[in-house]
Amino acid sequence: MRLGNLGAATWPLLALTLAGCVSTRPEPPPAPVTRAKTQATREASPAGDAPRALVPPGLRLDSRVKPVRQAVTLELDPRQETFRGTADIELALFADEPLRELWLHGDELTVEAATLEVNGRKVAVSALPVGEHIALVPEEPVGKGSASLHLEYTGRALANEDTGVFRAEEDGRWYAMTQFEALYARRAFPCFDEPGFKIPWQLTLRVRAEDGAYSNAPVEHEDVGADGWKTVRFKPTPPLPSYLVAFAVGPFDVVDAGRAGRNGVPVRMLVAHGHAAEATWAARVTPPLLEKLEAWFDSPYPFAKLDVLAVPGGPGGAMEHPGLITFGAQSMLGPVEGDSVWRQRMFAETQAHELAHQWFGNLVTMEWWDDLWLNESFADWLAFKVINQWQPGWRWDVRRVESRGQAMEADQLVSARSIRQPIQSSGDINGAFDGITYGKGAAVLAMFESWLGPDAFQLGVRRYLQAHARGSATTKDFFRALSIVVDRDVAPAFSTFLDQPGVPLVSVELQCPKDGPPRLALSQRRYLPLGSPGGQDGTPWQVPICARYTAGGAEGRACTVLSEPTGTLVLDGAKACPEQVHPNADGRGYYHALLAGDGLERLARQGGKGLSVPERRVLMDDAQALVASGDLDVAQALTLATKLLRPEDPDLVEAAVGVVGSVRDEFVPDALLPHRARFVRGLFGPMARRLGFVSRPGESEDLRMLRPSLVWLVANVGQDAVLRAEARKLALRWLEDRSVLSPDAASAVLGTAASGGDAALHQRLLQALRATRNERERELLIGALGAFRDPALSRASLELMLAPDVDAREALPILFNQLSEPPTRVGAFGFLREHFEPLRQRLPRDVSMWLLASGGFFCDAEHRQQAADFLGPRAEQLEGGERALAQALERVDLCIAQRKALRPGLERFLAHY
């Protein structure tokens, strides 16, 4: 699963305060669940018994009662909030002693009738709701054997939610969809809502005759009645956990994408009425990606069909349901002409991720949520590989390194999770969908794949999947399969990265003794940025380390595993003392590297000669991190970025932009802001002005992707008067004619114009917002409205979050855009304090958790305390809220410490400009 975005400009800001990825691109960290922390009880009183309290079983259901298969029939009209359903569940009872109650999940459902048959005998039963559970209390205790349960119930499909069964309206037409991962199948039907319960499902949907009905499996039978309704029965599915069940109802257009894969499965795109042409890219890329994955697994796609559905109004994200993958419409659909390059590439990456899940997660499912990494880490890791094979010109090996850096940004926190975090609450389950599980997990897999060898690693994965196909598995099962193939126990080394949080900091010092070959003296400790409350009390990692070096004009490579606090790597192949050493060959190691002595100076002197783009990118990422930890002077990091920069390489320019842009405004004294602007203009100005805001015919896709970040930095941080004036003119032209700017550039233009904009521009943007229903235009306009710095105008923009004609979800970027900028931060947080409760009520329950992130944007003790005082009591009421707030406040502490430590070095560096 990839969760949705709030707009390209917002996620980097929100990511600074959540445990997800930090990026200049829309790669969101999933949010924890928002749920009051309550433990419900209920009294039961079977005939002849005194009333007794019913206490639900907690996180995991009673293992003595297991489902065997389940059939669900739903009567669903997307125009209506209420739906009706029946659930028929075959059960196996394993109790040694008779059971007085049977438990299953059911949330916000009203059970109207229940019948139970045990070993062929009917037993009177009461069905009582208790929190997120349903207690089945039989008239008399029931023992071992087989049972069948029939439940009739009603539920709700809400229009302001995006989990469970939810509804959306577009152009007067209504659609109903589902999102059950992680804990929301229980809102659609009573069930055993845990990943380890993997059973066949058969769904039947009774819908209006004019609506289409879709689910995981192909249609078995369809019957149209004289009453204007039809009944659509789907074939039984292979064994699936409840979170992978899915269905959709509505007047969808169907785009035939042909047949794909070894079995020639039918591939279709399902889109809201009138949007078929916008699915062209999705239909084009899905079949070849499926075939690339089949080749890697040497196994056919394991399901009977492949529908890909664009959720109307959905801003982003995706879910891997077998046979019915879902995407937010903004992620999946794009105009036939003038589409965003970044949207196309991110759709392809996300689709590769979701298709990889058909094996990782769907064919073989984790036994319990603490092994979520077996789903998400593997899908992210393989998506990078497959995209790089399919489109090598995209250089997704650089994107992999970027993702690694984003994961490390989250993993530096003392409050960060480990990849395999013990699950103690439902908040822990939902909190596991974060940058640690996705990004760190993928980076760790890439590191161990490189250490063990790609071919052996691939064979180990195939062995694991073959052994557990159509079933469930654990991390131990994966380790066992991989260890057999490589003939060594991989568990100890792997576990040091899976079972503890943090990033190793490996110090590397080149030593060239006269009486032996050159060597690298290695030491490791936990990376901790300045201001961190953490200590060095963890278990040493077993770090696979590969170094690349140049000695006497010849290149060499040496590898080892650093298992102790210190170690040595002998460079046997070096015939002389190396001119340079890169401590992380190919950028595949999950560690920050500190080049001791003159190691960094050697690399800088060589200007990165002979280094690949991923290796240069890793050096820049490490330099940023070492500045934050106090191990490298900020001037050294900025100088290194200039030395490694190749103006002709957009990926390296983007990396250097990230290094320079990472210096927060709060770190720079007001008197030196003009100096910083001159430094930025001097380094990037010529490139930015040549590139401009407007795409040129024949321009490469890489330049189109670079434009927003490069030109925005020079125009705003560099205060380039020419670019700012151009942005104002182009913004006004864009308001008249959307074709004057590519989608990739429009955000930077509108944001730059708005940052210095007046009331007239604000009014024009507001009018344009209210005049369009085009989701992409609205995203751009809302992003611009969040960029105004004038207090009155920024306040007017914030009030859109409460406007009845604006969806609070789409307006939320305004809040985070303003929180990210010092001039508007205090006002934005004040607005949130005034309107926290109405905002929370207007947002979906999961999304409202993100409001806790607002406290993480400050960089001073006074406002940190205000955030803690205001948000603390609210976080206590939400599952996962305390961890989310702790991470936000920890980031404030880091910023305060780094501001104090880095200012002197910045002052010295910027004084020269």
Segments from the language model and where they lie:
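Bacterial N-terminal signal peptides
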Residues: A9-G20
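N-terminal, polar/Ser/Thr-rich
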Residues: C21-R84, D171-Y175, P195, A491
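Hydrophobic alpha-helical and helix-loop surface patches within well-folded domains
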Residues: R25-Q39, F234, R262-P533, S662, ...
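Surface-exposed beta-strand/loop patches in extracellular or lumenal glycoproteins
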Residues: D88-E108, Q202-R208, S523-C546
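A surface-exposed beta-strand-loop module
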Residues: L102, D107-E170, D227-G228, T566-A576
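Beta-strand-rich binding/interaction modules
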Residues: E112-E117, V490-A491, P501-N584
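Extended, low-hydrophobicity, Ser/Thr/Pro/Gly-biased non-transmembrane segments
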Residues: H150-D256, A279-W281, Y591, V613-D621
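Long, ordered, helix-rich scaffold segments
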Residues: R404-G405, A521, G535, T550, ...
